[in-house]
Amino acid sequence: MIEVLLVTICLAVFPYQGSSIILESGNVNDYEVVYPRKVTTLPKGALQQNYEDAMQYEFKVNGEPVVLHLEKNKELFSEDYSETHYSPDGREITTYPSVEDHCYYHGRIQNEADSTASISACNGLKGHFKLQGETYLIEPLKLPDSEAHAVFKYENVVKEDEAPKMCGVTETNWKSDEPIKKASQLVVTAEQQRFPRRYVKLAIVADRRMYMKHQKNLKPWVFQMVNSVHQIYRSMNVLIALVYLNIWKKNDKITVQSASDVTLDLFAEWRETVLLRRKKHDCAHLLTAIDFDGPTIGRAHIASMCNSKLSVGIVQNYTEINLVNAIVMAHELGHNLGISHDGNQCNCHTCIMSAVISNPPSERFSNCSEDYHQSFLTAYNPQCILNAPSKTDIITPPVCGNELLEEGEECDCGSPENCQYQCCDAASCKLHSWVKCESGECCDQCRFTSAGTECRAARSECDIAESCTGQSADCPTDDFHRNGQPCLSNHGYCYNGNCPVMHYQCIALFGSNAIVGQDECFDFNMKGEQYFYCRKEYEKYIPCAQEDVKCGRLFCFYTNNMDICRYNYSDIGIVDHGTKCADGKVCNSNRHCVDVTTVY
């Protein structure tokens, strides 16, 4: 057996610290210069790879020696990964590049219990690592014939825009009428209690603005983002694998606009009608360099994973720091996976699912995030993310009866004496001839469930219960009542299966004691200035007309606070698209309060 390869790279730190420099990550105030020297010892007869499976770096940070261990992330790409771009004349070109010998790594600092690292070794060393609770970035210095790199703290990168940034999701969580339950309180199956690993095949679409911004560096930028997202979700036992990349080089396939809710809806429609037919995947995210209205830098549909209509997210490339953009993507993926924003009851107020991006950004999930995700798995049972790795990944010779599903086997339940799986013929490791299905919401004892059996209950009055067809193991696509139908005793109107009302949006931001501000608070939206406006066009804040004030800034306050128009940085959201703004009227995508009978 070939011994595990160990590569040692020594970084000598010059006795020099720069005061200020412009790097790819931005303007850095304080940094150290290091020079990597690679020392490789290959086992006799071993095949030289472009990028080794394991590497070790030794260098100094603040004069103290550290050892950085790295391992190639072999789960970064799905086995059927493909890319689509477009020729100058608009022809679609899809390729299936080899991605096995890639250059993206995860790692840790030796003797640091909570350390992490996400590094690209494609052209020098670029990425981040955590040391003694602080986040450090490393990237090559672009000097001729030099191996010089810069190492610097995240806090030493000058932020061009210090205003708080936030997720655009302000609707209440997907089970707003029930308090969050701990995972231990849920009625779950034995399989779910074991926290089985989930597998998300992620499709990424980059719009023309992203291509114009990054050009030839766009693909490595995306790969490093997903590499960091993959690492973040390890703690949740969720594998994020890139299955597809589509670059809109010449023209955008939708009208990407600054209204994030409109862009999200347009992308969801394109994904359902075009992308799903082109490439099988579980969730799709759009990366754009457009500046969304207000402080919004991302948006996604909550509890939408595996939903053909809604399993999407959008992420604004608002900073040159790759890690921060990856954290925004991880946040929006969290919404897809049923995770709502962290509230006051959570043990962490600066974690990934905080509505406002923390500074420095966190790579941790709170206890609430874990509970929300487990609640989602139990309530929805999303089948698409329970797919185990391909059987071809197992390279040992198959042995029927060893309880391992191997190549050439349809099932393996152990010996005939011990087999407890009625669908499987233990002697042949094949399914019985009468078996119609093995799993699924509409599969019962290896046969399709009778037609008409409810397989997905209505989650709200705007949702529709689905029933089995008797011809498939899968529950039909999640559908909902028509947009504009009255809901919550006429306090709102249905929109994409939800009933968006201001009260629940306030609860999502502030907790159960929050209520909607007084009517006079919303008159501030006629000012047309930062935080008080209806929409933003070309960096200009457009004031609301009197009749549209409840489609601009959302005002909330606590019931025990006499300042009824109080607002702060954690409440900088715009009223949601589809929210009732007057009797018979809702907010449209242009932030006008319009007749509900004409908007949908």
Swiss-Prot record:
- Superkingdom is Eukaryota
The record lists the organism as Trimeresurus stejnegeri (Chinese green tree viper)
Where is the Peptidase M12B domain positioned along the sequence?
Answer: 198-389
Its recorded name reads Zinc metalloproteinase-disintegrin-like stejnihagin-A
What EC number(s) is this enzyme filed under? 3.4.24.-
General function of this protein: This metalloproteinase-disintegrin-like impairs hemostasis in the envenomed animal.
Residues annotated as binding Zn(2+) are H331, H335, H341
The protein's UniProt keywords, in alphabetical order, are:
Calcium, Cell adhesion impairing toxin, Disulfide bond, Glycoprotein, Hemostasis impairing toxin, Hydrolase, Metal-binding, Metalloprotease, Platelet aggregation inhibiting toxin, Protease, Pyrrolidone carboxylic acid, Secreted, Signal, Toxin, Zinc, Zymogen
